A protein has these predicted regions:
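Basic, Lys/Arg-enriched alpha-helical interface segments
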Residues: 1-93, 101-105, 112-135
Length: 135
């Protein structure tokens, strides 16, 4: 049986909307937006296969509704950064790094994990985006 939030983030990404009923959300998700108006996490999600978007979207929704939540779904990375940990088909692992800002979950960076530890360049990029703001 699937999770209760099947495909909702995928639908929002596809339709370029993310303002769903947030009345029940404890930590509504927002995409980081660069000064140029780009939303790197949304772009990354759109490039993934539909089943991967669905899995990651369900995990983000779980965090939105159950925050604060810990392992195995969410882990603190320090410096105000957190990661949503998603297991994809074929043994692949995805991570979405976020920060908490003004009562929202700001999605800063997403990637497919290929090493045991989170690469420093991914952490540095997320931290740079956090410092820039853009929520």
């Amino acid at each position: 049986m699937g999770r209760p939030f099947l495909g909702t983030l995928t639908a929002c990404i596809k339709n370029d909307t993310f303002s769903m009923n947030s009345g029940l959300k404890r930590l509504p998700a927002r995409f980081y937006q660069s000064d140029a108006g780009r939303e790197p996490v949304r772009e990354w999600l759109k490039a993934l296969a539909p089943e991967d978007r669905k899995t990651i979207g369900e995990d983000i929704k779980d965090v939105e509704f159950a925050w604060p939540i810990g392992m195995p779904l969410v882990r603190s990375l320090g410096n105000g950064l957190w990661e949503v940990r998603s297991s994809l088909s074929g043994g692949r692992i995805a991570r979405v790094i976020f920060t908490e800002e003004k009562g929202a979950m700001v999605l800063l960076h997403g990637f497919i994990k290929k090493t045991r530890t989170t690469p420093k360049r991914d952490l540095d990029l997320a931290l740079k985006r956090k410092k820039e703001g853009g929520a």
